Amino acid sequence: MVLTKAAISENLFEKLQLTKKESKEFVEFFFEEVRKSLEKGEAVKLSGFGNFQIKKKKARPGRNPRTGEIFLITARRVVTFKAGQKLKNKINNYLIKKNNNF
């Protein structure tokens, strides 16, 4: 199972009694704010969930595994996510409970 923006929007519609349009706009606005911050190189810290950050990767040599051709992988920025301790604990507690039910 995969959680999608549409599913998040539907949950907001059902649980917070927003209109479908409002719930969709809320989800879009949230992700747009996260994207804008990351584009500027700012970290996004969501208390109780985790942190998104931009890491700079230096240019480095790479190799095509099929042809063996050496080429330069250009410098770039990548998004990383580090789960917060509360999220890690909830996931681990869920897995422990799930495994004990077998």
UniProtKB/Swiss-Prot annotation:
CDD domains, alphabetized: IHF_A
Question: What's in the keyword line of the UniProt record?
Answer: DNA recombination, DNA-binding, Transcription, Transcription regulation, Translation regulation
The cellular component terms of Gene Ontology attached to this UniProt record, alphabetical and capped at eight, are: cytosol
Q: Name one GO biological process term.
A: regulation of DNA-templated transcription
The disulfides recorded in the entry are none
Q: Which PROSITE patterns does UniProt cross-reference here?
A: HISTONE_LIKE
Q: Does the keyword Transcription regulation apply?
A: yes
Record's InterPro entries? Answer: Hist_DNA-bd, Histone-like_DNA-bd_CS, IHF-like_DNA-bd_dom_sf, IHF_alpha
Q: Organism's domain of life?
A: Bacteria
From the Swiss-Prot or TrEMBL record, what is one GO molecular function term? Answer: DNA binding
Database matches in PANTHER family: DNA-BINDING PROTEIN HU, INTEGRATION HOST FACTOR SUBUNIT ALPHA
Q: In UniProt terms, what function does this protein have?
A: This protein is one of the two subunits of integration host factor, a specific DNA-binding protein that functions in genetic recombination as well as in transcriptional and translational control.
Among NCBIfam families, the record links this protein to: himA, PRK00285.1
Q: Which family does it belong to?
A: Belongs to the bacterial histone-like protein family.
> Subunit structure, per the record?
Heterodimer of an alpha and a beta chain.
- The name this protein goes by in its record: Integration host factor subunit alpha
Q: Which gene encodes it?
A: ihfA
